[in-house]
Amino acid sequence: MASAQEDLIDYEEEEELVQDQPAQEITPAADTAENGEKSDKKGSYVGIHSTGFRDFLLKPELLRAITDSGFEHPSEVQQVCIPQSILGTDVLCQAKSGMGKTAVFVLSTLQQIEPVDGEVSVLVLCHTRELAFQIKNEYARFSKYLPDVRTAVFYGGINIKQDMEAFKDKSKSPHIVVATPGRLNALVREKILKVNSVKHFVLDECDKLLESVDMRRDIQEVFRATPPQKQVMMFSATLSNEIRPICKKFMQNPLEIYVDDETKLTLHGLQQHYVKLEEKAKNRKINDLLDSLEFNQVVIFVKSVSRANELDRLLRECNFPSICIHGGLPQEERIKRYKAFKDFDKRICVATDVFGRGIDIERVNIVINYDMPDSPDSYLHRVGRAGRFGTKGLAITFSSSEEDSQILDKIQERFEVNITELPDEIDVGSYMNA
């Protein structure tokens, strides 16, 4: 888990360049390159434009390699998955080819790896040797400035004695192994490859791997030989409803992302509603919601620093345990407040969009957009804070103008979701894990 200081390095708030308005008074109560042909091949994703890879707080060596590859903006899959995957969360992701699934597990494992000579930390399984080489090339591309990290590929059809050579010298043996299931199981069974130090277990094109009885058996045998506490990530372009439960048997409370096409991205388990109201009624409504809803922790998003400060002050006057975080704070104070919220000292955080990118608090299960986000992209960043580690969350968006209504329409169209009006009563079980 990253430290609070690491979580908050180098955030900039271009989004806050809006005209400040005082809060109302409150009343109490690709695949990146899934081609892998040339390590210097340029590419670009049509992703969320306000976010760059630097917002994920990756190692400088990784950012440099990403820049060399010509990638500027992460794809939607990457910007939803990477903030969680680099924290060790299990991931089950379905998205068509070209959306950057490979880069999710390559970057997240390289971010977390601490190479030790003679120890394999990462296992990546795939169903063909061609795909294995593509993945190895991706590791080579992104680890070019991490000279101590070594990757090797293994597959059937060649004498296993050749594979033994790769593990003889600990100073040269791989930390990351990409392999087909049959050969990997043979290496483990013959005690050529020791898997007692594995921390990351990845299946690429997992449906192909798990639908085959033979490959599934090999995978299960290798899986059982690895430590019980490890990160498991599975990716595929196609993931039927029948295969998903099988995938999840290998996982613990995974982040589930299913992208059926370039526009549709569903955060499963997230209830999404709007409230139509006048600007002057927002504070009364936020007060009512905080009184009536059950929550672990809440993030309330506003559009400017001054509104964050004012709303935070008003909430505290009403005895709500609030704290505010925005880019106008000195770095040291920002880290201190972030840590207080992360450590559960405070249950309510009023924030600007600085909190909507790559920041993850396990207990947050409700997000309230006090001010409408300025774009569908910003909406996705914000509501993604809720229920990230679990399967349930609640997002409530205030709409107080015609412009707000238009943005809400764009959000629903972009992500093909139906955001309904907040009902008078909402079932706690729909947004709180039991």
From Swiss-Prot:
Ranges for domain Helicase ATP-binding: 82-257
InterPro entries: DEAD/DEAH_box_helicase_dom, Helicase_ATP-bd, Helicase_C-like, P-loop_NTPase, RNA_helicase_DEAD_Q_motif
Annotated binding of ATP, by residue: 95-102
Record EC number: 3.6.4.13
Subcellular location: Nucleus
SMART domains the UniProt entry points to: DEXDc, HELICc
Chief place of localization: nucleus
Transmembrane intervals: none
Motif Q motif, residue range(s) on this chain: 51-79
GO molecular function: ATP binding; ATP hydrolysis activity; mRNA binding; RNA helicase activity
Catalytic reaction equation(s): ATP + H2O = ADP + phosphate + H(+)
Record's compositionally biased regions (Acidic residues): 7-18
Domain Helicase C-terminal: 269-430
Chain positions of motif DECD box: 204-207
Enzyme class, broadest EC rank: hydrolase
A GO CC term attached to the entry: transcription export complex
The entry's keywords: ATP-binding, Helicase, Hydrolase, mRNA transport, Nucleotide-binding, Nucleus, RNA-binding, Transport
UniProt region (Disordered), positions on chain: 1-43
One GO BP: mRNA splicing, via spliceosome
A Pfam short name: DEAD
Known function: ATP-binding RNA helicase involved in transcription elongation and required for the export of mRNA out of the nucleus. SUB2 also plays a role in pre-mRNA splicing and spliceosome assembly. May be involved in rDNA and telomeric silencing, and maintenance of genome integrity. Links the mRNA adapter mlo3 to rae1 for targeting mRNA-protein complex to the proteins of the nucleoporin complex (NPC).
Domain statement: The Q motif is unique to and characteristic of the DEAD box family of RNA helicases and controls ATP binding and hydrolysis.
Family: Belongs to the DEAD box helicase family. DECD subfamily.
Subunit structure, as described in the record: Interacts with mlo3 and rae1.
PANTHER family, per database record: ATP-DEPENDENT RNA HELICASE DBP3
This protein's name: ATP-dependent RNA helicase uap56
Organism of this sequence: Schizosaccharomyces pombe (strain 972 / ATCC 24843)
Gene: uap56
